[in-house]
């Protein structure tokens, strides 16, 4: 495969700490390779990365940076397909993996592995299963790694010696984000959150289909872990959303997900909350007879049309071996069976999610902008059920809008508010309609209208530009007294 390591310089005092900057691995095809397909960044400075939280100072000094891995195809990889190691904010996108972990099994790993000293000399033996783990596309000791628009099929041998077998694995690292990915037919769970130094994870707007185990594998992760707006199509015969044997002890917060259990017989789901540290809010549960403690569940019987054609996602790679694009909301894609059906109970049934890891929530799996009232699952829709205005910039309380900076124009305002597609927004000062570069001042009204619905009006509360106005004031110690 392709393997980049950072070796110790002969004279580090003279040359400085070694690290890569600006590695781009693009448009490569790797077929039938040994332990790794693509791996970038293993460093002699690994001892600087021994905590869960990775500071920006540590990353700037010791981590490699500006790494992009995209548009690669990997097949029949002996172990892991793509791994980023000790990298600051790597971007891994539009890659396709199939048949990873081909050698991670009890036949190929049937003897004890050698243990090596710092000079590479054998100094003993490890257990037979040492190193017998491989997932497809994942980070190790990276900060704010983004994995998006990747596809993964049939990561192998989770039931035959491979301790992993997932398509995605938020392993030891800080701020890992998996978004807009598609996986099918992998032998373990969809996503593993692995170990106590796996923190601040985001898993959102992904589609999973027919994995051999339940979709989630919180294998001892700690701290913040958000799973929201995913669609999990769980194959018939499974009665859990968890990995079969990893214990599932890590915390996970689940919001706006579709848990779609295939088949016609309601599934008695086993243990929605192992270790008692899982939370649920606004998820949709299809074809189940037992439910978790969800703050606002949507319970759906088998036969209800939730998705256009559930289970119809691709089961193999594209003919040209490339990742299939799906970020244009006007385009037809092979994933369209996972768009929401007309009158789906998932439409306008979601909650407004705040990503605690600081990732902006812009669009869904298909590139559709997130609307004022979000949907449940990986797909948004154009359906309008209520006239609602919200913003990630201004404060909306009831029908009042506040915290507009001074001299906010109509154009600025419209760029910073969110309404459903097709809703008309009219801004007025008194009876005069404001447009373009007109300034939106306190007292202005914002009216939302949509055909067949009663309009809703919001009012702008006087701008809080947070500037200290001209006045006499008294300074005493650390206090400023304003009359």
Residues covered by each model-derived region:
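Short glycine/acidic-rich loop motifs that flank beta-strands on beta-rich extracellular proteins
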Residues: 1-2, 12-13, 34-40, 78-86, ...
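Solvent-exposed, low-complexity, repeat-rich "mucin-like" stalks and linkers
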Residues: 385-422, 467-483
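Predominantly extracellular beta-rich ligand-binding scaffolds that present long acidic/polar faces
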Residues: 177-183, 195-337
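Serine/threonine-rich, repeat-prone extracellular segments and beta-strand-based repeat modules
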Residues: 420-453
């Amino acid at each position: 495969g392709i393997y980049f390591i950072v070796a110790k310089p002969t004279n580090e005092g003279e040359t400085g700490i070694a690290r890569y900057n600006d590695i781009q691995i693009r448009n490569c095809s790797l077929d039938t390779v040994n332990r790794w397909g693509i791996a970038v960044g293993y460093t002699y400075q690994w001892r600087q990365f021994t905590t869960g939280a990775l500071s920006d100072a540590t990353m700037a000094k010791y981590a490699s940076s500006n790494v992009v891995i995209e548009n690669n195809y990997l097949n029949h990889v002996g172990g892991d397909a793509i791994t980023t190691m000790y990298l600051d904010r790597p971007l891994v996108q539009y890659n396709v993996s199939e048949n990873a972990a081909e050698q991670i099994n009890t036949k190929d790993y049937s003897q004890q592995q050698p243990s090596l000293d710092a000079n590479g000399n054998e100094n003993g033996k490890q257990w037979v299963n040492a190193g017998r783990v491989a997932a497809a596309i994942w980070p190790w000791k990276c900060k704010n790694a983004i994995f998006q628009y990747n596809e993964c099929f049939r990561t192998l041998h989770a039931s035959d010696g491979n301790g992993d077998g997932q398509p995605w694995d938020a392993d030891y690292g800080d701020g890992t984000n998996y978004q807009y990915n598609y996986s099918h037919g992998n032998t373990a769970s969809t996503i593993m959150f692995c170990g106590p130094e796996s923190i601040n994870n985001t898993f959102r707007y992904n589609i999973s289909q027919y994995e051999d185990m339940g979709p989630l594998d919180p294998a001892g992760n700690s701290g913040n872990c958000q799973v929201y707006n995913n669609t999990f199509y769980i194959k018939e015969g499974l009665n859990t959303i968890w990995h079969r044997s990893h214990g599932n002890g890590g915390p996970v917060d689940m919001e706006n997900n579709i848990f779609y259990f295939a088949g016609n017989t309601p599934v008695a789901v086993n243990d929605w909350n192992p270790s008692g540290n899982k939370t649920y809010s606004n998820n949709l549960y299809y074809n189940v007879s037992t439910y978790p403690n969800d703050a606002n569940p949507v319970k759906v019987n088998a036969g209800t049309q939730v998705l256009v054609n559930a289970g119809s996602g691709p089961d193999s790679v594209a003919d040209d071996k490339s990742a299939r694009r799906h970020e244009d909301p006007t385009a037809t894609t092979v994933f369209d069976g996972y768009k929401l059906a007309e009158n789906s109970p998932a439409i306008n049934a979601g909650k407004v999610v705040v990503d605690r890891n600081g990732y902006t929530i812009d669009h869904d799996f298909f590139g559709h902008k997130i609307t004022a009232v979000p949907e449940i699952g990986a797909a948004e829709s154009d359906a309008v059920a209520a006239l609602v205005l919200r913003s990630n910039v201004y404060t909306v309380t009831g029908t009042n809008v506040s915290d507009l900076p001074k001299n906010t124009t109509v154009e600025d305002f419209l760029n910073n508010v969110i309404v459903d597609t097709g809703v008309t927004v009219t801004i007025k000062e008194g009876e005069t309609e404001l447009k373009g570069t007109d300034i939106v001042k306190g007292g202005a009204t914002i009216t939302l209208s949509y055909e067949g619905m009663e309009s809703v009006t919001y009012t702008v509360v006087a701008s809080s530009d947070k500037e200290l106005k001209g006045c006499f004031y008294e300074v005493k110690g650390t206090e400023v007294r304003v009359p």
